[in-house]
Curated annotation (Swiss-Prot):
Natural source organism: Thermus thermophilus (strain ATCC BAA-163 / DSM 7039 / HB27)
Task of the protein: Heme chaperone required for the biogenesis of c-type cytochromes. Transiently binds heme delivered by CcmC and transfers the heme to apo-cytochromes in a process facilitated by CcmF and CcmH.
Cytoplasmic side: 1-2
Family stated for the protein in its record: Belongs to the CcmE/CycJ family.
UniProt KW keywords: Cell inner membrane, Cell membrane, Cytochrome c-type biogenesis, Heme, Iron, Membrane, Metal-binding, Signal-anchor, Transmembrane, Transmembrane helix
Protein name (record): Cytochrome c-type biogenesis protein CcmE
Keyword Cell cycle found: no
Length: 142
């Protein structure tokens, strides 16, 4: 009788462990940096990958008519030109950390999905701020 209970508990714990750790691995966002890509370009040509880094200041160009966003992604060592079709996320800006999903084609990363990194920490307004300043801060963050 004890053996059946022990076996049942082990099966439940095994299933629970698989759900927790198996699901965790699928939800993590792994990405290449521009330096990693440049070290082995042939391996990643025409294959779906995630590329992560910072949007290089002064390189952002957005064509509203064609819905094309062009920018250079850098890790501080190497740079890769990116073309993303679609509207940029509201928090997208120069110097911002991003992860772009897509493929390398002819030396340009063709992005299909653009994820913007942001801080997970909430910072309350500093003392002495007026409600208008707080409202402006909130609007800029959206």
């Amino acid at each position: 009788m004890k053996g059946k209970y022990l076996l049942g508990i082990l099966v439940i714990l095994g299933a629970l462990g698989y759900m927790v750790f198996g699901g965790l691995g699928r939800n993590l966002v792994y990405f290449l940096t521009p330096s990693e890509y440049l070290q082995d370009q042939a391996r990643y040509q025409n294959r779906p990958v995630r590329l992560g880094g910072l949007v290089k200041p002064g390189t952002v160009q957005y064509d509203k008519d064609r819905l094309e966003l062009r920018f250079v992604l850098t890790d501080g060592v190497a740079e890769v030109p990116v073309l993303h079709k679609g509207t940029p996320p509201g928090m997208f800006k120069e110097g911002q950390g991003v992860v772009v999903e897509g493929r390398f084609q002819e030396g340009v990363f063709q992005g299909t999905n653009l994820l913007v990194k942001h801080s997970e920490t909430y910072q309350p307004p500093k003392e002495g701020w007026t409600p208008e300043e707080v409202r402006k801060l909130i609007e800029e963050a959206q």
